[in-house]
Curated annotation (Swiss-Prot):
Location(s) in or outside the cell: Cytoplasm
Binding site for substrate: 108, 145
Keyword Isomerase attached: no
Family under the similarity heading: Belongs to the transferase hexapeptide repeat family.
Domain of life: Bacteria
Pfam families: Hexapep_2, THDPS_N_2
Disulfide bond sites: none
Name the record gives this protein: 2,3,4,5-tetrahydropyridine-2,6-dicarboxylate N-succinyltransferase
Keyword set, alphabetical order: Acyltransferase, Amino-acid biosynthesis, Cytoplasm, Diaminopimelate biosynthesis, Lysine biosynthesis, Repeat, Transferase
Catalytic function, reaction form: (S)-2,3,4,5-tetrahydrodipicolinate + succinyl-CoA + H2O = (S)-2-succinylamino-6-oxoheptanedioate + CoA
Gene symbol of the encoding locus: dapD
GO CC annotations, alphabetized: cytoplasm
GO molecular function, one term: nucleotidyltransferase activity
Length: 275
């Protein structure tokens, strides 16, 4: 089916979602599975960046991810420690892969990383022991470091570094209108969290322990401007606080400067790790 046909079928299935089950067959099942496969291969994305920098969300693709839960039963999944396993209804992205499939995919997956079916991982990506949820998109040259999590349908750009323990929020629970987006060439410091469909624009650097949601104040130190939901391009952001009522200071994120050569030297991509 074309994307237009898939969208029509998925929207119809969404309206009748309470009737969809593992027993569902025909066009509805085919549309759901074909959409999930397109997301998995990178042929389709939940969100796409336009030439003007705005992001368009394919809501129907996100709906297909949710409908995928309706068409499969829970089942045992092997591969756990001491012969154990897991109990789930979403396959691993790597189910049935042989050496040829790995070589064609072109990314590196360190033992104990988890990637669920319908997430796309581009060539040149390095996955340390981390978790990438369904419907996500991780673009070329990105490092997903140890214990970092990429939430459902999140969009991660090229040459991004997600440091240890970073959390990038998903869209499925609680339901979000748009995915969390980290654009190209960003560095997200250890244990930072970006959630609730926020956007970190190209080339930005978040210091260690920066938390950004839709209600987080993002303050430009130079101008005093307060913004929400989006970090401007090439910003250097650290955790801070602002005075509130009764002498209480509340958390905020502070843009302390724009990225310069000194910042780049500290946060640059190491090509040796991607050979």
């Amino acid at each position: 089916m074309s994307n237009a046909q898939l969208e029509t079928a998925i929207e119809a299935a969404w309206e009748a979602r309470d009737t969809i089950s593992p027993a569902t067959t025909g066009e509805t099942r085919e549309a759901i599975e074909e959409t999930l496969n397109a997301l998995d291969s990178g042929a389709l994305r939940v969100a796409e960046r336009g030439a003007d920098g705005s992001w368009h969300v394919n809501q129907w693709a996100k709906k297909a991810v949710l409908l995928g839960f309706r068409i499969k039963d829970m089942e045992a999944q092997s591969g756990g420690p001491q012969g154990g396993g897991w109990w789930d209804k979403v396959d691993s992205k790597f189910l049935g892969w042989n050496s040829g499939a790995w070589e064609k995919a072109g990314f590196r997956a360190v033992p104990s990383c988890v990637v669920r079916k319908s997430a796309y991982i581009a060539p040149g990506v390095v996955l340390m022991p981390s978790f990438v949820n369904l419907g996500a998109y991780v673009d070329e040259g990105t490092m997903v470091d140890t214990w970092a999590t990429v939430g459902s349908c999140a969009q991660i750009g090229k040459n991004v570094h997600l440091s240890g323990g970073v959390g990038i929020g998903g869209v499925l629970e609680p339901m979000q209108a748009g995915p969390t987006i980290i654009e190209d060439n960003c560095f997200i410091g250890a244990r930072s969290e970006v959630v609730e469909g926020c956007i970190v624009r190209e080339g930005s650097v978040l210091g260690m322990g920066v938390f950004i949601g839709q209600s987080t104040k993002i303050v430009d130190r130079e101008t005093g401007e307060v913004m929400y939901g989006e970090v401007p391009p090439y910003s250097v952001v650290v955790a801070g606080s602002m005075p509130s009522k009764n002498g209480v200071n509340l958390y905020c994120a502070v843009i302390v400067k724009r990225v310069d050569e000194r910042t780049r030297s500290k946060t640059g991509i190491n090509e040796l790790l991607r050979d």
